């Protein structure tokens, strides 16, 4: 699927921090965007200011007619959406192109020089700093939080270089193809998804193996790469 040929994009769970960054990206690149979320928020208000139509009731009657043409519409959803969600199941049952958020992020960044930041802690701060540093060279950054100096979770640049906050939830980061990646930490988290810490660690190892160029890791993590530390001997230290 070539995203350049998709002109209408509907988000199920558009108010999520990761979903809203992608919605901003498409809207500011001239795509027609709309979506559903459970409750209004500052994030959904910001999206509406961009001209994105959002509703807060799970009902087919609320889907704008422009998004009911399955040959022209991409549907993006978050794994946090309930399996019995009426709108999502309508799109699935009627053979729309339906992709998870992580799959779409992977497709957006696959043709860029991608720098991904993963870790159970520290990835939002690190990716925000990296995105800010690379803003003068027109990198596009997808963040997992609102950067105060940009008032956004998207730093929009060109499509040559990207910075991505790589989320381990639901193994989402395995949809990325990073050239350079950083892993800040690997604590036992999301065990409702992974079941045990060993499975989480295996997922990080799989992510590390997808890096085509350079992997940078906090010292002490069970991954092979350049190391960094504070007041300890490492490849890079402060």
Predicted regions and their residues:
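ATP-dependent carboxylate-amine ligase
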Residues: 1-54, 70-75, 91-96, 128, ...
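Phosphate-binding loop of NTP-binding sites
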Residues: 25-28, 48, 61-67, 72, ...
